[in-house]
Each structure stands twice: as C-alpha cells, then as structure tokens.
C-alpha cells in the first residue's frame, strides 16, 4: 500500500496497558490512543468518515468493530459465532465442520458513504450502516442493511477462512468467495484422486449490487482444475486503454483479469476473462511424471515425509494470496502459501496488463525469484517495489527491471503487507513493526515493539498511523 500522507512517526511507544483495555497515555510516546477489544485482530483496519473499522476475534466469535478515529471510543460492534457446516457433502467426510478456523473476521472493510461492506467469519457478505444503532436497547450494536449468504446461495466451502475483502466499483461489489479444498487433504501426502473439493462448481469471484445485495455476475475461470488449497486473494482494479479490468489472484497460482461490468445487469451474467497469467514458474511444478498434488502436500513442513526443510529452499507450486497491484499498465503480484506450511521459494511477477488470452509468455516483463513465499501485497512508489516475504525479509526492487537493490532480514515471520508513506516503509512482523527509509539504499529507522504479533497491515489517514495486533489491541500513532 502507498499513501501521500506526511508527518508520520518513525517510532512510537505504546505505553502501559491498563486493566480497562486502554493505554496509559502518560507512559506512551507518539500515541493518540490504544484500545483492546476482543482476543485478536487479523484484518487490516479501514478508515473513512472519521471512523475506523476493523474485524477480529472475541474468544470463538467473529467481531467487526467501529471506533471513533480521533478518540478510539467504540461506537458499535457486530458479533457472531462461527458457522457450523455439514460434516459430509456428496458422500465425502469433510474435515472442517466449522467456518472459520478460530480466526474470526479477516476481511478488510470497504466503505462507501453511509455503508460499510465486509465478509464475515460465517461466509456472509455483509452490508452495515456506518452509524450503527443509536436507540436503546440496541445502542452500540451494528445495524445490518443486508446480508448475502455465499455458502447457502452459491454452495461455496471456504478452507480455513472466508476472508476476501470487497472491491467497490460504482454500484457494484466484487468479492472473492474463498472457495477451497477440504482441509483433510493436508493431513498426509494426498494423491490427486484423493483430493476433495466440496464445491467444485462454485464461483471464485462474484459481483453483487451494493444497494441490495443481489447477485449480478459470477466468473468462469477454471481455477478448480488446479486449486491447491484455499482462495484468499482479493480483487483490485485498473484502467487499461479503454477497458476497466478487475484483477484476481487465483488459488491455482494464476492471475486473472476480468472485464468490469459497465452497468448493473438485470439478470446474472458471466464475467468475461480478458487474460490469464500463470505465476508458477515451470521449474516450480512437479518434476517429471510426479503427481502435482502429492508434490504440493510434501511442501508442507508438517506433513509426514515432507520435503520442506523450512529454510526457504523448497521449490514447488504456490497459490496467490496477495492482492494484485496495478500501476501504469503493469500488474505486480507474488505467489505464496499458508505460513504454517513453512518457508519455500516464492516468485514476484511484473505483468504487462495490455494483453489478451493466455499471456504467460508474452505478458511477462520480469520475474524475481529471490524471495520466499509471501502473503504480502506489494507497495510501488517512486520507481521502486517493496515486498516482504514469509521468512521476514523486505525486498526493494526496481519497478521497471526487477533489479534488487537491497534486502533487509528481520529474522521473524511476516504475514501483512508493507505501507509506504512519508519517506518510510512500515513493515509488520510477528515481533512488531519495522520502519525503514524509502530509497535505493538500505536504512533502518527503528523497530516498534507492540507486545503482540502484527498480522494485519498498517494503514494511515489524516496524519495517524493505525496498527492492529493479534493480542486484540488497536493503536493510533501520530507525531506529538
């Protein structure tokens, strides 16, 4: 992510955490407020209209909370238990009978006027009123405008989490369904014939009318044919020539470009696939006549007989978890896997977005293979690309050539994405937030310890940096 905000802190001290779930500001430095709500925050905060929206977990229930951006006061909260799903589908025993897997709401919110949209821990696309409920006895609770149940309406079955973040384009919402495989596939080196996809015909990306939640379009990408695990990427948007395209990173390791709808159709239609680009380098695929599903499973360091030494050297297939980034007719996107599978070789691609059809060969501008698997969305600013990997390294590359200028090793895992703003690169890790200077020379400005892991990405608005931790704390930092 990139922001034009200025005057941001290069360091802050959270201060003493108090028993009432707030920060003692007399012991803090460059902190406007800090609050603890629930057990953990996994989603990246969204800031709009003087409010902060963030999803998380409270014990075993998903939560979505709205705060006052200036004071940290909780204005309202939505909360729901995990969803029980059928234990068998089409005669198959399904390993995950609860959605999601103890991680709550992971989707980041999209805000448009007086409405806020997100995907819940129950695989529902939610539309809430940003004002919440004001009248007793419901004051402090969310006001639901509409709900679209993707599991019930589409038959999708998320693997681990339903965490896609909505994309607003006019009156339309583009949302990933998070359809995936049965988690039992990864209990042992499964053969291809043993792989279970509970919903093999469900869509991967849908479009709904943001005003009433009506389904208006679905994709027809052949992702299920090569689905590896789950689908945790989110769609993005770009204008290419006279076309508006929606980009999506598939669970098969392929980046897709769909033509955006020009208007809201009266009846559901199919999205037109403009191009596809296979982000899995040929040498990463199963060697010889090897079963590619078995090879993928053996890349999970927890599996018996694993080939993964957790040192970043394992080479194998990966899905796309990061969100594709569009800049100047180019798409930047990297491949990765669930961090629990361990480290392994990744790949970052720069793709010419002006193509048509299968552009794997002709659309390649450059590929960088010097990074580990990654979940992180890249930041592109001032001719440079910043991307972190699961191994905890931050890479700075030339955006036109892919030349690597420097690598900073934090010696800890990274799940979130970088934020570039005010001449700084903010990098979330499992041991806090690193701050580095932008540019072709490596310069570390500091590390901020927050008392918990930072899986979400930091965001900035109105001179304030917002950072959420897995301990359920949300911090608002600014120059003082």
What are the functions of these language-model segments?
Residues 1-480:
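Noncatalytic, solvent-exposed loop/strand surfaces
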């Amino acid at each position: 992510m990139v922001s034009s905000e200025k005057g941001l802190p290069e360091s802050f001290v959270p201060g003493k955490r108090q028993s009432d779930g707030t920060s003692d500001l007399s012991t803090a430095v460059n902190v406007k407020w800090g609050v603890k709500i629930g057990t953990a925050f996994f989603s990246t905060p969204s800031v709009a209209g003087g409010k902060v929206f963030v999803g998380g977990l409270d014990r075993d229930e998903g939560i979505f909370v709205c705060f006052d951006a200036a004071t940290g006061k909780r204005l309202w909260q939505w909360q729901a238990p995990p969803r029980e799903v059928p234990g068998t589908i089409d005669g198959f025993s399904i390993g995950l009978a609860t959605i999601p897997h103890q991680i709550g709401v992971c989707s980041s919110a999209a805000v448009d006027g007086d409405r806020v949209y997100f995907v819940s821990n129950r695989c529902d696309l939610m539309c809430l009123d940003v004002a919440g409920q004001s009248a007793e006895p419901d004051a402090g609770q969310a006001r639901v405008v509409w709900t679209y149940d993707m599991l019930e309406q589409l038959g999708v079955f998320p693997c681990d989490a339903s965490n896609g973040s909505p994309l607003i384009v006019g009156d339309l919402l583009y949302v990933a369904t998070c359809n995936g495989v049965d988690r039992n596939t990864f209990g042992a080196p499964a053969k291809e014939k043993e792989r279970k996809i509970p919903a093999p015909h469900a869509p991967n990306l849908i479009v709904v009318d943001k005003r009433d939640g009506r389904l208006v379009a679905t994709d027809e990408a052949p992702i299920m044919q090569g689905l590896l695990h789950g689908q945790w990427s989110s769609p993005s948007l770009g204008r290419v020539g006279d076309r508006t395209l929606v980009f999506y990173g598939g669970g098969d390791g392929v980046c897709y470009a769909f033509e955006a709808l020009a208007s809201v159709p009266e009846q559901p239609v199919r999205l037109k696939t403009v191009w596809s680009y296979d982000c899995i380098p040929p040498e990463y695929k199963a060697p010889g006549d090897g079963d590619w599903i078995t090879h993928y499973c053996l890349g999970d360091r927890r599996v018996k007989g694993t080939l993964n030494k957790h040192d970043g050297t394992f080479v194998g297939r990966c899905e796309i978890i990061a969100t594709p980034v569009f800049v100047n007719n180019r798409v930047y996107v990297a491949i990765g896997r669930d961090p629990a599978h361990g480290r392994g070789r990744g790949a970052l691609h720069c793709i010419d977005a002006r193509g048509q059809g299968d552009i794997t060969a002709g659309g390649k501008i450059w590929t960088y293979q010097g990074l580990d698997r990654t979940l992180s969305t890249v930041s592109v600013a001032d001719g440079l690309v910043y991307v972190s990997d699961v191994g905890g390294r931050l890479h700075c590359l030339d955006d036109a050539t892919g030349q690597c200028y420097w690598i900073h090793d934090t010696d800890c895992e990274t799940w979130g994405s970088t934020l570039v703003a005010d001449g700084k690169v903010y990098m979330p890790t499992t041991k806090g937030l690193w701050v580095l200077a932008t540019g072709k020379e490596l310069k570390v400005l500091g590390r901020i310890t927050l008392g918990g892991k930072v899986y979400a990405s930091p965001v900035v608005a109105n001179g304030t940096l917002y950072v959420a931790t897995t301990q359920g704390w949300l911090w608002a930092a600014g120059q003082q």
